[in-house]
């Protein structure tokens, strides 16, 4: 609508007064951001934070239209989402623990046909998966689902694939977001040091230009709080 009206600004009102450096309900030292880029905002949304709808961010970037996230209940300035990237620093930390990793194990090697059959079955039952893959020994299929669907998925798979042993375990994504942060090795070193201090094992690390994503099986808000304090001043 903003683009169609050729408006200069778009204001989106909600029950929070802008975009924060982390979830203020979980991390009490979270800080409101004055400005953030569309690309960084997209990464925050993709990481699981429910701040702005993906489509809203995509349209803002496409039409080069600044978006202001503000509170319905106050006159505070809010957060400006724009094309411009101010600086290379950590802007946001997202903990997504609403996930479960599913393992489907078989005594014999899983054929390519079986691998695809399981995937099609999940699609047919409207189960959205991430990281769908086969283990190196080709005897386990593993993937990630939303925690809300864990009982449904367990029941469906056990009923359909009786020659597989189905198990689950906790799966947590910790995303550290900010343009160019992967060029600063000290950021990841600090995070790994804090995780090691609390004996939290890292399962995987994924990097792109704007995000460090660390896969864990657990992490408390207190630990995230310490990471936040270390990275965001």
Labelled PLM ranges:
Residues 1-233:
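C-terminal catalytic "cap/lid" subdomain
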């Amino acid at each position: 609508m903003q683009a169609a009206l050729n408006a200069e600004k778009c204001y989106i009102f909600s029950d929070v007064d802008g975009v924060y450096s982390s979830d203020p309900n979980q991390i009490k030292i979270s800080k409101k951001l004055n400005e953030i880029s569309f690309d960084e905002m997209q990464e925050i949304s993709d990481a699981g934070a429910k701040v702005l709808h993906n489509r809203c961010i995509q349209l803002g970037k496409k039409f080069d239209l600044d978006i202001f996230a503000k509170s319905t209940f106050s006159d505070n300035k809010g957060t400006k989402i724009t094309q411009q990237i101010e600086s290379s620093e950590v802007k946001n930390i997202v903990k997504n623990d609403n996930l479960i990793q599913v393992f489907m194990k078989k005594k014999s090697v899983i054929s390519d046909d079986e691998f695809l059959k399981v995937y099609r079955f999940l699609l047919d039952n409207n189960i959205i998966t991430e990281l769908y893959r086969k283990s190196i020994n080709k005897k386990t299929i593993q993937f990630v689902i939303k925690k809300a669907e864990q009982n449904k998925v367990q029941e469906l798979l056990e009923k359909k694939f009786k020659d597989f042993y189905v198990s689950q375990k906790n799966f947590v994504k910790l995303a550290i977001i900010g343009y160019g942060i992967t060029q600063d090795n000290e950021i990841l070193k600090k995070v790994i040091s804090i995780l090691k201090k609390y004996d939290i094992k890292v399962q995987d690390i994924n990097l792109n230009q704007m995000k460090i994503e660390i896969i864990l099986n657990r992490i408390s808000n207190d630990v995230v709080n310490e990471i936040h304090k270390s990275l965001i001043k």
